[in-house]
Amino acid sequence: MRRTFAGLTLALSAMLAFSTAGPSPAIAQPDMEPTAAQALLDGPAKAWLVADMDTGRVLASRDPYASHAPASTIKVLLAMTVLDHLRPESFARANQSHTEVECSCVGLKPGQAYTTRQLLEAILMVSGNDAANMLADMLGGQPVALAAMNRKAALVGARGTRASSPSGLDGPGWESVTTPHDLAVIMRAALKYPLIAHIMRQQTAQFPGKTITNQNELLTRYPGDLGGKTGYTNLARKTYVGAAQRGNRRLVVVQMYGSGDLYGQAIKLLDWGFAQP
């Protein structure tokens, strides 16, 4: 059952799906009118979702199962896949092919050794596409890495997700897809990895030859922010997935196909979500 208002779906009892089979969960009839959430319609994201991290209850959403390109938010899925197969202290040396990529980049130097942890910090904090390429090679090459990422997506319940590049870069014939629902599921699963949760909260990290600074502005703008990942490509437009905690409650927010101030909308979504019973 579903009630919509100008494209807005309030799903006060809906649950995020975490199984790998079966239909998407039904959205229960809300027990309040959607007028309380009308202000959320003014946000710049075409599709979005805010949900309780611990119960999986979707508090509000617009087009939560609409498929969009994820851009760099797919790096959260890559991070989980990496930690399923590689130890944080394992290392490899960068080569020229890792750096031949459209940036954003952390600035890998061919011949320099990097640990798995350093590369995870690079993809989660500064969205390094070069680091994503290197991690894919450490997993056995891009075809192997992408197959592992897509298996991981299915395993955690993100059944509408397909990664076609480890970094989120896209183009004709290699478009990645996901949904707001799936990104919320992926983020919830990722924050169960202590190292991912720690990295996403770091303001800075030491990287060979430099200090890198986390690009997630909500770390400083929103009290209780637990971390987040931005993304942008021409196909995806602006994307964001993040989480925050207030008291004992944790929420996850997803925004897809956006323009303008996604951080401002994320703050409104989180504030509204924390105000709900």
Predicted features and spans:
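Penicillin-recognizing serine hydrolase domain
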Residues: 31-46, 141-277
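Hydrophobic alpha-helical segments, especially transmembrane helices
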Residues: 3-4, 76, 246, 250
